[in-house]
Amino acid sequence: MDIKFLYDNHETLKEQKVTIIGRVRSNRQGKAVSFMVLNDGTVLNDLQVVYKPETFGFEQGSKARVSSIVEIEGILIPTPTRPQPFEINATSITLLDQAIEEYPLQKKEHSPEFLREISHLRARTKTFQAIFRIRSTAAFAIHKFFQENNYVYVTTPIITSNDAEGAGEQFVVTVNEDKDYANDFFGKKASLTVSGQLNGEAFAQAFKNIYTFGPTFRAENSHTTKHASEFWMIEPEVAFADINDNIQLMQDMLKSVVGYVLEKNMTELEFLQEQLEPGLIDKITGIVNVEFKVNTYEEVLKTLQDAIDKGHKFEENNIHFGLDLGTEHERFICEEVNKCPTFVINYPKDIKSFYMKQNDDGKTVAAVDLLVPGIGELCGGSEREANLDKILERCEFYGINPEELDWYIGLRKYGFYKSAGFGLGFERLIMYITGASNIRDVIPFPRTPKTLLY
């Protein structure tokens, strides 16, 4: 029997004997009555236990420190006038394991910075229990959405020889201290993947609808609240699809996942709304209930310039074609102008990746970013370039050796008519849903520069 079972069935269990094992959150002694608060991790809500000097095992129970493990036998008593719907009047207490006095999570407020230093313990706090339970629900919801829509789940390689993003920020995998890659394990330079997209495109040509969901790695020496060296990516790919199909898929998937979390984790969301972000539930409910807007990149530039002309100040006021939009620009568009999630399409080709389809205007590509209030860019994707000559020309522009991607580029030789997909950073989505302000707080054991504690 666990605490979630008691909450789910407390009306039918009233006045009945129950047995529960849990971890002590607090233990307060009084002259006539003592109170112990337990949690076993199965539900965010705690369980209050009432015990008295005549309770069997009272001495053990009264000595139980915070984080100790106890077994409680007792009677479930309804408490409709109190914050919790019921409590347990203990008839027996057994101290199964006593925690040391120096347990770091005592009953007081702890800073996020301190809790990041004890990632192996912080999941025991209510805030992190709420965040990681929502993370679990959202991960399931992603698989649920794609499986119910006839997508094939593809596990793409973690060790790879390609840099899908062309940024060169990869972790090298080697067993050779001399970095002689020709004599290394794979006979060539190998790295941890930055994206499963290229491999996913190959499988989309076989199955039409595929998605990947797995870890990716970036050797980016960044210390911002949005960047981590290891994170998870969702990357669907659809053959015969264009940018409009891609936009619809982004919207459908996001609405489905957020809607599922709202259905399954309202208790956690209410707690996080109180602790982390007032208005959180209304914010994410807006994702489900509103229709997203679409603006072209050049429309966005005009809107930004108009705002500057009327006196608005950005940190970057030099608005020009080729500008890589900053978070301040993205948030202004979706928060102040459109007041809803916004797709921005048709970016300059020279600020986007080599594999994106070139538009007929010769200067833009069929790329799309989704901007959401409170965060800016949430995910991005594109229609893929199907023309062999054009993709070779883009490889040359970016200094990419086409021989290293011969298998990928060669897909265009064997029947290739459109393909589109996008990448969504899972942790960025969880930050948005939970109101967490730092990516380190939505990953169980975060990996960031100079930090590898576990």
Swiss-Prot record:
KW DNA damage (keyword) present: no
Gene Ontology CC: cytoplasm
EC annotation from Swiss-Prot or TrEMBL: 6.1.1.22
Gene3D superfamilies named among the record's database cross-references: Bira Bifunctional Protein, Domain 2 (3.30.930.10), Nucleic acid-binding proteins (2.40.50.140)
Pfam families linked to this entry: tRNA-synt_2, tRNA_anti-codon
PROSITE patterns associated with the record: AA_TRNA_LIGASE_II (PS50862)
Class of the enzyme per the UniProt entry, highest EC level: ligase
Alphabetical list of InterPro entries matching this protein: Aa-tRNA-synt_II, aa-tRNA-synth_II, aa-tRNA-synth_II/BPL/LPL, Asn-tRNA-ligase, Asp/Asn-tRNA-synth_IIb, NA-bd_OB-fold, NA-bd_OB_tRNA
Keywords noted in UniProt: Aminoacyl-tRNA synthetase, ATP-binding, Cytoplasm, Ligase, Nucleotide-binding, Protein biosynthesis
GO molecular function terms attached to this record: asparagine-tRNA ligase activity; ATP binding; nucleic acid binding
Location in the cell: Cytoplasm
Gene Ontology biological process: asparaginyl-tRNA aminoacylation
Catalysed transformations (reactions): tRNA(Asn) + L-asparagine + ATP = L-asparaginyl-tRNA(Asn) + AMP + diphosphate + H(+)
Protein family: Belongs to the class-II aminoacyl-tRNA synthetase family.
HAMAP family: Asn_tRNA_synth
Subunit structure: Homodimer.
Protein name: Asparagine--tRNA ligase
Species this protein is from: Mesoplasma florum (strain ATCC 33453 / NBRC 100688 / NCTC 11704 / L1) (Acholeplasma florum)
